[in-house]
């Protein structure tokens, strides 16, 4: 189990700050650190919105488990009652989480991987950072939305 610290506040400014620091890493050719920051940004955002619901984030250490918890708490499941384009985007979010987790686990500075390391390029690192920032912003927006009158 992994100890997940309580996040005091995650807001758009925080998301921009982490993303900016990751871009600086990219500009300094430190792609591994940028990928690690991408995952950290998602983990912290997921934990924050879980805690907003008064729940305790899972301590499994798997980012996919945190995202599953977020989806359950905020009813973010694909549905036949939702426009197919929205469902496609929600499915894409799953792939972002999975890809960032895999890349960080297999190619970043988080673990020694020896000769199996895949050296990514700057444009790939930017894709990871920008995808994580976009997803973090979306998750925050979902958590902060006002309930509609119908609910």
Residue ranges and their predicted role:
Residues 33-37, 48-66, 148-150:
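Short acidic alpha-helical/loop segments enriched in Asp/Glu that coordinate divalent cations
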Residues 89-149:
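Charge-enriched, short contiguous segments at helix-coil
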Residues 1-34:
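Charged alpha-helical initiation segments
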Residues 54-93:
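Short, charged amphipathic alpha-helical segments flanked by flexible coils
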Residues 19-23, 30-52, 129-137:
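Short, hydrophobic, well-ordered secondary-structure elements
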Residues 8, 28, 35, 60, ...:
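Conserved phosphate/pyrophosphate-binding and hydrolysis machinery centered on Walker-type P-loop NTPases
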Residues 16-24, 80-85, 113:
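Short, charged/polar, low-complexity loop and linker segments
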Residues 22-29, 52, 111-115, 143:
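Secondary-structure edge/capping motif, primarily at the C-terminal ends of alpha-helices
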